[in-house]
Regions:
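A general structural signal for short secondary-structure junctions and capping/turn motifs
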Residues: 17, 37-39, 118-123
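Short beta-strand segments
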Residues: 1-31
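C-terminal edge-of-domain segments
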Residues: 82-175
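An N-terminal domain-start capping segment
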Residues: 25-47, 158-163, 170-173
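Beta-strand secondary-structure signal
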Residues: 26, 46, 78, 127-131
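Short loop segments at secondary-structure junctions
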Residues: 18, 52, 80, 133-135
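A short, structural micro-pattern
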Residues: 7, 21, 41-42, 69-73, ...
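Short, structured beta-strand-loop surface elements
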Residues: 31-93
Length: 175
């Protein structure tokens, strides 16, 4: 939350686990991003990972007295921020993230830190480590419905032709 109210920014993130089993999430954003001004050392933060989600039509239930809804799965990482402003640490953060995302490339891109333009760009970002204190899983996939409604919903999602809806059907646990 900033002075102008709640803020949300979609960021590149990387989950890391140390030898003791502690999770942290490395992330970065532009210093010019208004959200960066409200993020500080020791502040609490939440990283949201939205999973499969989608509109659920009342037509898809066996019972006909329903309204539309939204089914979803999500995971929240809740923790404390540590600001990363040191150039060397920022370069390591970018390197780790790049290595992870370029892993499948035939000729993976690597930062040339001797290039002044690339170095200037890394100094235009601010990094953070979110030390995860707890994880929360959230899901709403029809688990509160009757077995008949769940089976009907699952069948309609599977037959939708939409890969996202078909995956949502796989997330459902039918009684």
């Amino acid at each position: 939350n900033g002075k102008q109210g709640p803020q949300v920014t979609h960021l590149p993130m990387q989950l890391l686990t140390d030898d003791a089993g502690n999770d942290s999430i490395n992330l970065h954003l532009s210093k010019a991003n208004p959200h960066a001004k409200g993020l500080e050392n020791g502040k609490s933060a939440v990283a949201v990972f939205l999973g499969t989600n989608g509109y659920i039509s009342p037509r898809w239930y066996a019972a006909k007295d329903n309204v539309p809804t939204w089914n979803y799965t999500a995971v929240h990482a809740i923790g404390t921020l540590r600001k990363i402003e040191n150039e060397e640490e920022l370069m390591k953060l970018v390197d780790k993230l790049t290595i992870e995302h370029e892993a499948s490339a035939k000729s993976p891109w690597r930062a040339d830190w001797s290039n002044s333009k690339i170095r200037k760009m890394v100094n235009a970002i601010i990094g953070f480590e979110l030390k995860v204190e707890r994880w929360e899983g959230k899901e709403k996939v029809g688990q509160n419905r009757s077995a008949e409604d769940q089976a009907s919903l699952k069948r309609n999602l599977e037959n939708s032709g939409d890969p996202a809806y078909q995956f949502l059907a796989k997330q459902m646990k039918t009684s």
